[in-house]
Amino acid sequence: MEITGTILRGPDLEPVEGRVIVDDGRIERIEEATTESTDIVCPAFVNAHTHIGDSIAKEAGGGLSLEELVAPPDGLKHRLLRQASREDLVDAMRRSLAFMHRSGTAACIDFREGDVAGVEMLREAADGLAVDAVAMARGSIDAMHAGDGFGASGANDDVFDEERAATREAGKPFGIHAGEGDASDLDPALELEPEFLVHVVHPEPRHLERIEAEEIPVVVCPRSNLVTDVGVPPVEDLVERTTVALGTDNVMLNSPSMFREMEFLAKLSDVPAREILRMATVNGADLAGADYGPIEPGRPARMVVLDGDSDNLAGARDPIRAVVRRAGVDDVREVVSSA
């Protein structure tokens, strides 16, 4: 397979004109050459934080607070999940995953409610789709063993010492929501020595220093934070200190579109477009433990090809800014998957 156009090559997403040669699902080489193609070849996206279980309840709960919406065990989301049938939950999740694939997402890191059964539903929903659904289970240690890691709701919600120890012993990642509504759960979350934190909207200087010193990655979800009215994460400060990835959070609140998340962050912050695209691709892939990420020889071929001559993108002078600030699912010409 040969893909031509402007290639966003390597971890620095360097735009080069040429072709990507793919053989047996892997990138064999990248050749710089003049080409007539106007396509933009970008690493596939990795949505680093989702809750796709609430795909059954899109746009439910308008006007509710964060706690009323999602706090376990009786936030609106959790009540709706309990009321829904297994068939409806799996079908709704599958449709969200199908949309992710169509919009160029290769993987999502899903905080999976529902204990062992929830992990099994996610596996069923993803079966046969070219999206790697990483199950960060919750509810029990058994769920963690059934899934790919443990995704804790927050250190103010429960004590997670046993789950943390079991996850470490199993050699799996432990992630936790922290600093979303306020700073009160950041210290206990950091004491758990997580592989990554989610949200970190309200860090104090000491939290930022510790995140930097301990090299703890952070996933930010700015659209979700605005919807739930908890504030805006200090993304510029976080990017200076650690690896930052990008997620869309609950499907009930936001579409799982990395295009929308990137554009929103680009226009909300002063973070450069190249760094935002790295957050949505390379950094997320690292967090997911995926072999893909940068477009470079030897990597699995997971790319999204955008039509640079679409009515939306034609005339763009900067391909990285075009992808981050302007592109959308309608501009996707092809999703290349080695899965």
Task: Name each region found by the language model.
Residues 5-6, 20, 25, 49, ...:
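Divalent metal-coordination and catalytic microenvironments
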Residues 191-192, 234-312:
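His/Asp/Glu-enriched, well-ordered alpha-helical/loop segment
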Residues 85-99, 136-143, 181-186:
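Short, acidic/polar
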Residues 32-64:
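N-terminal cap/recognition module
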Residues 1-34:
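N-terminal metal-binding scaffold of metallo-dependent hydrolase/deaminase domains
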Residues 8, 300-339:
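C-terminal cap of metal-dependent C-N hydrolases
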Residues 141-234, 239-252, 271:
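Active-site core of metal-dependent hydrolases
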Residues 40, 56-128:
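Alpha-helical scaffold segments that flank or form the walls of functional sites
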